[in-house]
Structures are given as structure tokens and as C-alpha cells.
Amino acid sequence: MTALPRYSVFGNPVAHSKSPQIHQQFALQEGVDIEYERICADIGGFAQAVSTFFETGGCGANVTVPFKQEAFHLADEHSERALAAGAVNTLIPLKNGKLRGDNTDGIGLTNDITQVKNIAIEGKTILLLGAGGAVRGVIPVLKEHRPARIVIANRTRAKAEELAQLFGIEAVPMADVNGGFDIIINGTSGGLNGQIPDIPPDIFQNCALAYDMVYGCAAKPFLDFARQSGAKKTADGLGMLVGQAAASYALWRGFTPDIRPVIEYMKAM
């Protein structure tokens, strides 16, 4: 009996990951059977865990917190997106035994905004809240969509300035944000503790979309605040999660899943 193609997601913690359910839905669309497992790698043991997985026949892996930067250094070669982001969320085994690193987070975000939410990015003004790895990972792909302006706001200005200089965008301290933005994207993790970024409510007055990169309950504080402050449309990061997974699946298997039915399936779970 032929073994099924094996895929995985590495993280710590990783028990909460919805990636196995998402990728099984993609496999149903393709009409194939796959295995997809969660692997909780020890801090300090990520490289060995990845090596063991691929040496025993692994066909592809996703990488989540806190290993995306380590995965970048582990990969033997990188896509342009991964190089720009300085982080890897997708590992692809090559025929020569090496690993290629890619970053599909930005594709997941922009496909959700433009294809599922039907909001154009080109010519729009975008505010990014936060300056961590999640935000850094999506800036290169956002820029490809040619927005009129990208502003990054962070609690500590130095970190925002660092990303602004790296990517040729603007930076402001969180408390000094003013003016209207078409799209406001929250990349801070405060929602996990019920907190919202320290921003004035009037910045949402002309906001076509307020988007939180996390999904579920963790997105609720920010999205409620945005809605009450005048944002026309709000969305959590479930579509981004499914979108980045679909891009990874396509890199591994050469099959591009339709993300819309999978987003609806995950909402119903």
C-alpha cells in the first residue's frame, strides 16, 4: 500500500492550529488523500524536527509562531517574498535534497481583501498597526498592489521606523495617527488579551475595511471598536489564514484551491 503524501505545520504551541482541517478541504477539491499533522517542536529543537520530518518522507511543511525567522535561516534558498519578509511560513523540499523557503502570508491577506472582500488595494491609503513579524511579512505583497500610501504605526516608534526605512513607507507613533485611511489592518496581538491599539476612533470615519490579522474571538475587540467608530466593513483574519494555506498547497502540489468554500466551511465549524 502506497503511503499518503505527508504535510505538517510546525509551531509551539500548535494544538490550536486549524491548518489540518483547511488542507484536508483542499485535498477534497483536488480529489486526493493526504496526511497533514501538527508538530509541536521544542524551542531549540526546530531544525532537528524539520530535518527528521523531511528525511522520513515529508512532502511540505508550514511554519507558524515562533519559528518563522528560524525557518528563514534553515532554508537553503528563498523566494523573493521570503527574502523581503525575512521570514518563512512554507518549506518546500527540492529534488536535490535542499529546502526552499517561501512566505505566503502576504498573498493570503491580499487575496482575501481583493478577491473575497472585493476591495481594491491599488490607489488606496493603508494603515498598518504593529511592527512585528506578521506585519513585516505582508508589506512586500501589499506594495505589489500599488496602494497610494502605506503608513505603519507602532507603540514604539523605532521599530516602525526600521520597517518604514526597509520598505520605503511612512511611520508614525501609534498615538499620533491622524487622517482617514481606506484600509486599516491590525497586526498587533493585543486582542488575545482583550486589548485594542491606542488609536483615535476618528481614523475609521472613511475606512472601507478594518481588518484584523488574527481570527475568531481574538479579533473581536479591535473589530468592535472599528465598527463603532465608523468602519464600513470589518473582517477577521480567517480568510488570510485560508488564503496563505492555499498558496502553500499550490507550491507543494501544483493545484490552486478555491478559498471561498473553505472559508465558509471553517466559519461553520
Curated annotation (Swiss-Prot):
Protein keywords: Amino-acid biosynthesis, Aromatic amino acid biosynthesis, NADP, Oxidoreductase
Pfam families tied to this protein: SDH_C, Shikimate_DH, Shikimate_dh_N
Binding annotation for NADP(+): 80, 130-134, 154-159, 213, 237
Swiss-Prot/TrEMBL GO biological process terms: amino acid biosynthetic process; aromatic amino acid family biosynthetic process; chorismate biosynthetic process; shikimate metabolic process
GO molecular function term, any single one: NADP binding
Enzymatic reactions: shikimate + NADP(+) = 3-dehydroshikimate + NADPH + H(+)
Enzyme class, first EC level, given as a word: oxidoreductase
Pathway this chain belongs to: Metabolic intermediate biosynthesis; chorismate biosynthesis; chorismate from D-erythrose 4-phosphate and phosphoenolpyruvate: step 4/7
GO cellular component assignments: cytosol
EC number: 1.1.1.25
Residue positions of the active site: 68
Binding residue positions for shikimate: 17-19, 64, 89, 105, 215
Family (UniProt): Belongs to the shikimate dehydrogenase family.
Record HAMAP family: Shikimate_DH_AroE
Subunit structure: Homodimer.
Job description of the protein: Involved in the biosynthesis of the chorismate, which leads to the biosynthesis of aromatic amino acids. Catalyzes the reversible NADPH linked reduction of 3-dehydroshikimate (DHSA) to yield shikimate (SA).
Record-given protein name: Shikimate dehydrogenase (NADP(+))
Protein encoded by which gene: aroE
